[in-house]
Amino acid sequence: MQPKVRTAEIVKQFNLKIVTGEEGLHRPILTADLCRPGLVLAGYYAYYPAERLQILGKTELTFFNNLTYEEQLERANVLCTDETPGILITRGFDVPEAIVKAADETNVPLLTTKGHTTSVESQITNFLEAELAPTTAMHGVLVDIYGVGVFIKGASGVGKSETALELVKRGHRLVADDSVEIRQTGDGILVGTAPKLIQHLLEIRGIGIIDVMTLFGAGAVRSHKKISLVCNLEIWDQAKVYDRVGLDQETLQIIDTEIPFLTIPVRPGRNLAVIIEVAAMNYRLKNMGINTAEEFAGRLAQAIEDGNGGL
């Protein structure tokens, strides 16, 4: 299902004043793109993106006010369609009577703000991009470890929440437990958050549900985090060969983004929190251009080439 935002949400978010068209506040906004309809006001009606929120600033209104009333009414009627989610007048300018009349007849929300046009456009676009971003929900835990968003996944009961608790005790920050809502806010950018119902909560078998912020303080949690690394916990399988060098980098596709993926086998005696902590630090090192596995492979190849028997 395609995400959508109602015009009423824009009004509330940016404290906009409603001039007319309150009955149309339920209209959906399906794109983050906005429109400054200068060509429509000039009389060119082809390719008018009526489904976008329309922004009228100083340039558009100055031109519009120089038209005859009949021309104003004609072009205002083109602006106001059944699918237009709203028309926003910026900089606190007076709303032309022709636009008020057309918006009132078609129930198009006519809004005003005192903000500058460019600033308002930028803020609304950023808000819509976040709200309309492709979204999915995944089972797991998201923790901020040294600034790296690590998504811990695995079968139920494998120890994800317990590992997250140990990480929080070691000074890292919990974002979400059990269910992580993930939005793709841009190319290659995934941001995870917790559903409001379970925000800051951890479920520990044998204890129950605990409030991490209450127990460990506000510094132990955060509301959202970009996902940079996925660690999959699985019960150790003796028949399976696990990566012992780290040359091959697997990835996991979430929505349309490929994220570095590590499989961490679980068995008694392995400190998962420390292992995941080191995985996050190693990820940061790789981003800084330091790849220990590749350096080792290079040294090994050089030693073999030199016939070094001291291996």
Curated annotation (Swiss-Prot):
GO biological process: regulation of carbohydrate metabolic process
Metal-binding in keyword set: yes
A Pfam family this chain is assigned to: Hpr_kinase_N
Entry GO MF terms: ATP binding; magnesium ion binding; phosphorelay sensor kinase activity; protein serine/threonine kinase activity; protein serine/threonine/tyrosine kinase activity
Protein name: HPr kinase/phosphorylase
Highest taxon in the source lineage: Bacteria
Family matches, as Gene3D superfamilies: HprK N-terminal domain-like, P-loop containing nucleotide triphosphate hydrolases
InterPro entries: HPr(Ser)_kin/Pase, Hpr_kin/Pase_C, Hpr_kin/Pase_Hpr_N, P-loop_NTPase, Ser_kin/Pase_Hpr-like_N_sf
HAMAP family: HPr_kinase (MF_01249)
Subunit structure: Homohexamer.
Catalytic site positions: 139, 160, 178, 244
Annotated source species: Exiguobacterium sibiricum (strain DSM 17290 / CCUG 55495 / CIP 109462 / JCM 13490 / 255-15)
Catalytic activity as recorded in UniProt: [HPr protein]-L-serine + ATP = [HPr protein]-O-phospho-L-serine + ADP + H(+); [HPr protein]-O-phospho-L-serine + phosphate + H(+) = [HPr protein]-L-serine + diphosphate
Sequence positions that bind Mg(2+): 161, 203
Domain notes from UniProt: The Walker A ATP-binding motif also binds Pi and PPi.
Region of interest (Important for the catalytic mechanism of both phosphorylation and dephosphorylation), residue spans: 202-211
Protein family: Belongs to the HPrK/P family.
Originating gene: hprK
EC number(s) stated in the UniProt entry for this protein: 2.7.11.-, 2.7.4.-
Binding site for ATP: 154-161
Keyword Flavoprotein attributed: no
